[in-house]
Amino acid sequence: MEMFGVHNPATELATVGLGGAASVRYNFSAAALYEESIRRGEAELTAQGALRAITGQHTGRSPRDKFVVRDSNTDGEIWWDNNKPLSPEHFALLRADMLAHAAGKDLFVQDLIGGAEEGHALPTRVVTEFAWHSLFIRNLLIRPDAAALPSFAPKLTIIDLPSFKADPARHGCRSETVIACDLTNGLVLIGGTSYAGEMKKSVFTVLNYLLPAKGVMPMHCSANVGPNGDAAVFFGLSGTGKTTLSADPARTLIGDDEHGWSENGIFNFEGGCYAKTIRLSAEAEPEIYATTQRFGTVLENVVLNERREPNFDDGSLTENTRCAYPMDFIPNASETGRAGHPKTIIMLTADAFGVMPPIARLTPDQAMYHFLSGYTAKVAGTEKGVVEPEATFSTCFGAPFMPRHPAEYGNLLKELISRHGVECWLVNTGWTGGAYGTGKRMPIKATRALLAAALTGELGQVEFRADTNFGFAVPVSVNGVDSSILDPRSTWADKAAYDAQAEKLVSMFIANFAKFEGHVDGGVRDAAPGVKVAAE
């Protein structure tokens, strides 16, 4: 077996059963991985210098093909209602077959770190069949100093072989695609998919399992920090404005997707960003756009024209087009990936029912309730001729990546909020003046003004009212914001229609939360909609 690149001889691939590979390229640089990707026909160079790859059949994650090994360690710790179990015997067969499949192949290895806080960092080795996957994960995770590579000892290993096809009958999985996580032994096996995001989210899943046992809260969120060290965390599902609202030229970006909250403050899990690019423009998001126009960035499933220029308006391959780039490609990104304890937590929702106010203050109990609910609303597909919004509840604002029971994360979050006196706000970026179809989208200018008022503390000085549906506190007036939009009912022409819509949404919240009732205390249960008590 030929070996190239700097690595620790004591942890060579032979130690995990990959000694039969034809060659191994350890910790290759971006330039070397460009050469390998293009030479092997995996990817192509764009006119501006980025590397474009197409993932084929899988243009997104495959949550139905993700499994967790159920053994004596994980049996009582994993939320099996939301995680699919795989027996240790099936995993052993899968591992043996994947190792055999890798024999004779050229493999690429990156030795990286998950977690910017040293005491909670996860040394991670990612072994890939594709050179461009090696560049992708090198961009996304934290790169250790070159001097640390000769002694690097991974605690998590990910083996990513897109050409491997699983056998459901033999391996206990659902299809030819498989993402299998052995949390006890720190091994993730990915086969049958070329979608690079599976690697990134596998690291997130493992950290989400490991950290709560150490009292560290893992979060699916973006985060930034102001010039006075006032950190803010933004929870939110896809399409709620998490990336857009945390990108603030007056504040330093900590990260855009995954963070931990420890005894020392917040820290990024990653060293890069994985941003959506569909309909990306230089005018609307100049910093992200600029990353797509340079060497080092990976473009995933982005259509190129005949001049090899990306067309971000073309979703013919998928609407889920992406770019992956290191954090230092963003001008105002944090160099450390760390900040102190958050002063403010923002929970974003895009309420397409038009019921929720644009901003509301939450007590710690209400914050835990809305964190466990993880609500947003998607607009139904126009091709079906349906204009009724669809409520989406993804607990902890990231259910697919949470191995433990949601109440474990929720209780930890509530405890940290109370201990550090964090202000919590629910911000609705959805519809006002009616539901989707009759109302209009919440003006981004108003959202930014309300957010700024929350972050600066200005909202602490205004008068509040209790929301009659959700019980949280809503400001009556805010400088620079049209007061009418602060009361959603007043923006509807038909008040009876608003009341009916509100009653419908409240009933959805209550029905969704029923599964958590037995896992939370009375204070959180009393934070349910319909309890008309405002935050003090």
Curated annotation (Swiss-Prot):
Q: What is its main location?
A: cytoplasm
Keywords, comma-separated and alphabetical: ATP-binding, Cytoplasm, Decarboxylase, Gluconeogenesis, Lyase, Manganese, Metal-binding, Nucleotide-binding
* Subcellular location field: Cytoplasm
GO biological process: any one?
gluconeogenesis
Q: Quote the record's binding site residues for substrate.
A: 61, 195, 201, 322
Q: How is the cofactor bound?
A: Binds 1 Mn(2+) ion per subunit.
Leader sequence residues: none
What GO molecular functions are on record for this protein? Answer: ATP binding; metal ion binding; phosphoenolpyruvate carboxykinase (ATP) activity
State the protein's purpose.
Involved in the gluconeogenesis. Catalyzes the conversion of oxaloacetate (OAA) to phosphoenolpyruvate (PEP) through direct phosphoryl transfer between the nucleoside triphosphate and OAA.
Q: What is this protein called?
A: Phosphoenolpyruvate carboxykinase (ATP)
Which species expresses this protein natively? Answer: Rhizobium leguminosarum bv. trifolii (strain WSM2304)
Designated gene of the protein? pckA
